[in-house]
From Swiss-Prot:
Pfam families: PRK (PF00485). InterPro entries: P-loop_NTPase, PRK/URK, Uridine_kinase, Uridine_kinase-like. Pathway: Pyrimidine metabolism; CTP biosynthesis via salvage pathway; CTP from cytidine: step 1/3; Pyrimidine metabolism; UMP biosynthesis via salvage pathway; UMP from uridine: step 1/1. ATP binds at residues 12-19. It comes from Bacillus subtilis (strain 168). Keywords: ATP-binding, Cytoplasm, Kinase, Nucleotide-binding, Transferase. It is found in: Cytoplasm. This is Uridine kinase.
Amino acid sequence: MGKNPVVIGIAGGSGSGKTSVTRSIYEQFKGHSILMIQQDLYYKDQSHLPFEERLNTNYDHPLAFDNDYLIEHIQDLLNYRPIEKPIYDYKLHTRSEETVHVEPKDVIILEGILVLEDKRLRDLMDIKLYVDTDADLRIIRRIMRDINERGRSIDSVIEQYVSVVRPMHNQFVEPTKRYADIIIPEGGQNHVAIDLMVTKIQTILEQNAIL
């Protein structure tokens, strides 16, 4: 292992293309030591709440996340200690009892809508990205994801977007753009920006005597 792992924070609205950017960067370093951490695995455990109450969870509010737990895990990885990454069950609206064992790596990509909102998280990052995509495209992607991956109905997704996602984006997500070192328009389709990011990451790794 090298001296200091590199932490890359990738933020942006729901459906902005954060995951595509993350995967593109990951693929570029596939032969190296790299891992991905999704912020939405670190929603707070709600097993103590009745199921009906969990249904009202606002997943787009900063208080929905257990950032203390996430920060603890990032700090462990920075010190080359393995973690037991949580799994979140979106159908039961709480944290699963199962975990995934994750070994430390030289590059850590932290991705999520609000990874730039908490200063404690920002202070752990070497590079901060914000993926900026038009709202129309984001809602289409959100609808497709929640229906296909989370078993939601189209009516419930649209209702949630209008009443929760959009106002939370405007209040909490969009303002974090100012903390980004680089703003990437058009998400994973912006190959020029991604190539520049890869070059920057390689430079940091070389400086840290990892590559």
